[in-house]
Every structure is written in C-alpha cells, then in structure tokens.
A protein has these predicted regions:
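Conserved catalytic cores of very large enzyme subunits
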Residues: 1-96, 132-135, 139-686
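Extended non-globular scaffold/tether segments
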Residues: 97-108
Length: 686
C-alpha cells in the first residue's frame, strides 16, 4: 500500500506531462489527434509512444565474435576520425561517446552477476551445483564484453545482450534470430574438441528456453487487448537456407527442437523456415512435436516467397536469404534493419462501414471519414469500391503522418543507442537507428479485417447489384440495427453469397483485391528516414477489440463481434470444404505484396493426426500450400471441449499453450473475449 501511494501521489503525477506518450500530442497533427481521441477509430499508433520500438533483430553474431569490447574500440576509432567540418559533428560525437558509456556499463553489469555467482558458490554445499556456479562466474567475467569462446559463453553472451536491450527500451519482440545458425560454430567446435557432449548442449539450450519466460512486459489496457496474454514474442528461427541458398538444417537444429519440446513454454516464439531443400525428416520432427504438444507453437514460413518479397523491398539476395522472423510473423533481414515491424493496426472493416454510410460512424453517429457518397444513390458496384478505396487512402495517409511524427518524437527524446550498436550501418554512418542509421529502414503496418471486407463486397456485388435479392435500404437498415428486425436478411447474407475459404474464385479474388489495394496504398509512402512502409496482413488478437468498433457488415457478421482471425484466415465456420480448399483460397491473396507478414491459422482435432501417414499428409499440405506461394501457416491441435473446460477451470490448465495469432500464450491468461474467439475457430475433424 505504501508503494502504491508513492506511485499514485508522486511518480505518476511527475511523469504525466513528461512521458513520450503525452508529449506525442505536440508532435501529431491536431486534426489527427481528434480522430485518435475518439473511442471509434480506424487506426491507433499511440502504443508506439509508450516504449521503445523493439521489433528488430540485433546482430548477435557480431557480439559473439568481437564482444562489446570490439564495439567500444570501433566507437573510439570513429571518434578519433571525426571530420571537424562535418555538419553532424556534434551529434556523431555524442553518439559514439554514448556507445562507449554503454559498453562500460555492460562490463559493470556482467561483473555484478559474476560476483553474485561466486558468492553463491562459497555457500553452496552441493558439489555439482558449486561447480556450476563457479563456471557461471567465470563466464560472466568474460562475456558479453569479451568475444565468446565456447558454446556456453555464446549462450550467456546472447542472453546478456537481449536482457540489456529489454531493460533499456522496454520494447517488445527484440528477437533472437536464426539460433541454429548463430550458435552452430561454437557448438561444433566444442563437440569436436570434446569440451562437451550433446546432452550437455541440450541442457544448456533448455535453460536458455526457460530464461525467456523471465521477461514479461506489462502492457497498457489497450495493448493488452490487442496482444492478449503476456507475450514478449522473442522469436527464434530454425531451418531454411543459408546465404548461398543451400539447406541450413544442421545437428543443432534438432537439438533446438528437442529443447522446444522439453520446455514448450509460451516463450520463445520458435518459428520454422521451410525450403524445398530442407529434408522431410526435419518437417516430420516438427509435426511430431506439434501433435504431441497439441499445437500452439512452431509456425511455418515459406522461404521462397519471403525471399522474393524481401528482394522486392530492396534487400540484397544474401541478406534476404538470411532473414529471420521478428515478433510474430514479420520477415526481416538479420542484424542490419530498423524494422519497426508492428507500428500500427489498420481497421479495413471500419473503412467499409464508412464507405457505405458516406463517412459516418454508425457506432457513434459522428462524421469520421470523408463524404464519399451515399450507398442508396450508387448505381454500380464500382462506385462502392471507389468509395471504399477513398476511405482507405484517407486514413492510411493519416496513419503515415502520425507514425512519422512518432518517429521524430523518438529521434528527439528516446534515441536507441544500444539498439544502434547492434545494427549494421549505424556505427558506420554515425547515426542512431531512429535517425536512419541502419543499413535498411522500414515501418510495418498491418491491415485487419481483409476477409470481412472481401466477403461483404462479394455479398453486395452478388445479392444487391447482380441478383437483386437484397435492397440497399434493407442492407443499410440491417447494418444499423444489427439485423434485429430482419433476421432473414442475416441468413441470406451468410448463406446466399459465396465465402472466402472454399476455393471459390469469385469470393477469393474479392478478398485478394482488398489485400492488394491496402498493400499498394501503404507502399507509396516513405518514413522520415526515407525507408519504406511495409504492409502486413495479420492482427495478433487485435481483431477482437477492433471488431468492437465496427457495426454489422454485409457479410452477415454481427455488430461488435471479432473481425477475421489471423489476417488471411477464412472467417470462422465459413470454410466448409476442408483444409485443402482453405489453403487454396488463402494462396490466391498476393502474399508477396504483404512483405511485413501474413497469418494463416488452422485448427485440427487431435484424432486426425494419430498415425505417421496422417502426419505425412500434414507435411504434404504445408508443402503444397507453399508451392502456391503461401507465406505462413500455423496450427492449434485441440478440441473445443478442452478449451471450454480450461476456461471454466483455469487452475487445471495453467500450462496449456495455444496459438493466438502470430504468437503463443497460456490460454488461461488471455482475455475471455480472445478465449472465445479461439474456441470459435473452424475445427477440422475426421
């Protein structure tokens, strides 16, 4: 109570007008702030003002090779060679001096841990544990300041590097990258030299997996709704190809899978890169773990389409092949990219609502968007498409403006010096990563509700303009009243127009149009540092709170209910023809345009994956879907009965991990609305 009083009466009042969250109001245009202050909005970038950006891949390999000692030496060299006539002289001098101070701080921190472990060893009576503590102390005296010389030191160096980053900027999704590639040289050397055996390496990996549960980021109310659970989304990646395009699966890949199976916690968010060059043995091992652990983790990513998408973004072939996943599903070049991969969610379904009501929000009655015409007066389907596109373009422009303002805010108030030390390009340019210093610079923005919009447009085209089964007046009235006075209308909308997810070209191409229009609209803009805006088609759990802001839709969706899950997944219960048809529909969306990532969820009954033949069919499904240029797929393998039981008796299911969207979480820690949404997803059974 004393701490609470101190926080409420002294700490919070002091920071109220000093924190970046409040200062952002002076950076974002007043017209846009009025939109953001409304409880009903198309986008909300303000969570990016309350912490550092996170969402990037630090160059861990560099730290392992040269240590922070090497970083410090580089900074000193650049200080000595500064051009006195450089117009950025003062900024660069301060930048490099800040790096030196941080490197000195890293030494202080690791030595504190070394001292703690040594003191614990003095009091330890168990000889085995005493030796472990002494080894920990020895490692902490060396790394991460010095280069790592062993597998154990490499893991310890990595953990310090990540931990310091989280403490420093309080961001999310600062990810580990391709751990089976990064740590393999140290593993191979120690095995060949007899320093350790596989079982010891596996135990160290398991300890590393466990440590990732130490980092819990407490979010704001809104961020907790958009990202259910306590996911930090530190992503590990296994498999794929190397920089030369060859199979990258190695012995350490399988040990990492063993560690994942043994620990199987919500963190780290371990992902699987899939190439046609990877052996089926690798895929089958992943499927075995998925089935045994009832899914909930280990999403699959398609190397071929992702590498092509990154090349379209201007990434070199070598860097594109060395991509890893940031956070949930965001493909990002490793160690050289200021990605800002989860900058904002954009509510596409709200734009359709506004397009049908001449820019007026039906939840508040206020004029929110531009006047794009009254649906009652439209004489062709093309007019509603045009109105929808104008609403999207209007709000995307606002979103970009606000994000650029937030970028300036971070550059002015919260330079990410530590992050800059871990990104190629910043040291060389003398610029912080918030000021365009990294080799590559992007911002990722996610379109949410693509399928809801596509299915709604299909219904309008077919039932209103082509067949005349539904009048414009009845449709608008049904949307206003949530179909309460006309339940038959809802039935017709749900059942008499084709739905995405059933390999129906009419429905699928409409959804593909919605995704393409959003992606192209986003791609025309640059951020303050000249980097591109990269579109994504995923939602984490934001489809639930964003759905609360949208009235009933022509697809038959009720007012305030969740928008489509995943991002490119078919709507719950609408994919009636099984997983193959669903996958074929999803593959018709141009994933290559959505280079910031997509999310495709499937849910299976455990009973259909019992035998080796069943599991091989799942491997074949994944490879077939990827051959059609699908980017991502992931699975929950649970019965709805078990999830319902866990909802009723959470104390019995505290370790139940589920796949929410692009991340995993303990089911019992999720908001009930998100639990209900997961339970309601289409279940594929025998």
């Amino acid at each position: 109570e004393e701490d609470k009083k101190f926080l409420l009466e002294e700490i919070y009042p002091y920071w109220e007008n000093r924190c970046t969250g409040n200062i952002s109001r002076y950076y974002i245009d007043e017209k846009i702030m009025k939109v953001l202050d409304s409880p009903y909005r198309v986008f909300n970038p303000l969570s990016r003002t309350r912490s550092g950006y996170g969402h990037y891949l630090p160059n861990i390999e560099k730290i392992l090779k040269i240590g922070f000692k090497g970083i410090e030496e580089e900074a000193y060299r650049h200080l000595e060679n500064l051009d006195l006539m450089d117009l950025e002289l003062t900024d660069k001098r301060n930048f490099y001096k800040s790096m030196v101070i941080i490197c000195e701080g890293v030494q202080v921190l690791q030595h504190r841990f070394a001292e703690l472990a040594a003191n614990m060893a003095l009091e330890e009576t168990d000889e085995r544990r005493r030796k472990e503590l002494l080894l920990i102390a020895e490692n902490c005296r060396r790394v991460p300041y010095e280069p790592a010389e062993s597998f154990y030191e490499a893991l310890q160096s990595y953990w310090f590097t990540i931990l310091i980053d989280y403490c420093g900027q309080n961001g999310s999704a600062i990810s580990g990258g391709r751990v089976d590639q990064i740590f393999y040289p140290y593993y191979k050397k120690d095995i060949e030299n007899g320093v350790m055996v596989k079982e010891e390496a596996r135990e160290l990996l398991e300890a590393l997996w466990v440590k990732h549960s130490d980092i819990i980021k407490a979010g704001t109310y809104s961020s907790a709704k958009n990202n259910g659970g306590f996911a930090t989304t530190i992503n590990f990646v296994l498999g794929g190809v190397d920089a030369e395009g060859n199979d990258a699966v190695n012995e350490l890949t399988y040990l990492c899978l063993d560690a994942e199976k043994s620990v199987f916690n919500s963190e780290p968010n371990t992902s699987i890169r899939v190439s046609g060059k990877n052996p089926d043995r690798f895929m089958k091992r992943v499927i075995e773990i998925l089935v045994e652990k009832e899914g909930g983790k280990l999403p699959f990513f398609n190397d071929d389409i992702i590498i092509d998408a990154l090349r379209d973004d201007g990434i070199s072939l070598e860097d594109a092949r060395n991509y890893a996943i940031v956070g949930c599903v965001e493909p990002t070049p490793y160690g050289n990219t200021m990605g800002r991969t989860n900058s904002c969610y954009f509510n596409l379904a709200k734009c359709l609502e506004l397009a049908l009501f001449d820019g007026k929000c039906q939840m508040s009655g206020q004029q929110m968007g531009p006047k794009t015409g009254k649906f009652e007066d439209f004489t062709s389907f093309e007019q509603i498409k045009k109105a929808y596109e104008e609403q999207v373009e209007y709000f995307v422009k606002m979103m970009v403006s606000s994000l650029n303002a937030i970028g300036k805010l971070h550059a002015d108030y919260t330079p990410h010096i530590y992050c800059s030390m871990l990104l190629d390009g910043c040291m060389e340019s003398g610029r912080d990563c918030t000021r365009g210093g990294a080799k590559y610079d992007f911002a990722g923005v996610q379109g949410v509700g693509m399928v809801d919009v596509g299915d709604s447009l299909t219904a309008i085209k077919k039932l209103v303009f082509e067949e005349g089964k539904v009048s414009k007046k009845d449709l608008l009235e049904g949307m206003r009243t949530n179909f309460e006075a006309n339940p038959l209308l809802k039935y017709v909308l749900l059942n008499k127009a084709p739905k995405y997810g059933n390999d129906n070209d009419e429905a699928d191409q409409m959804v593909a149009y919605v995704g393409k229009q959003y992606c192209k609209c986003v791609r025309q803009y640059k951020n303050l540092d000249g980097g591109s805006y990269r579109p994504g088609l995923f939602c984490l759990s934001s489809n639930t709170p964003l759905g609360k802001q949208v009235c009933a839709l022509p697809s038959g969706r009720d007012s305030g209910t969740p928008l489509g899950d995943g991002g490119v997944s078919p709507k719950h219960g609408m994919d009636m023809l099984g997983p193959t048809a669903a996958a074929k529909s999803v593959a018709k969306v141009d994933h290559r345009l959505a280079s910031n990532g997509v999310n495709f969820n499937l849910k299976f009954m455990p009973t259909i994956l019992k035998t080796d033949a069943d599991r091989q069919k799942l491997v074949d499904l994944i490879r077939a879907y990827f051959s059609m240029n699908g980017m991502h797929i992931q699975f929950n393998i649970l019965s709805p009965e078990k999830l319902t039981e866990a909802q009723k008796h959470p104390e019995k299911y505290r370790s139940l991990v589920v796949r929410v969207a692009g991340y995993s979480a303990f089911f019992v820690e999720l908001d009930k609305d998100i639990q209900d949404e997961i339970i309601s997803r289409t279940l594929i059974g025998a």
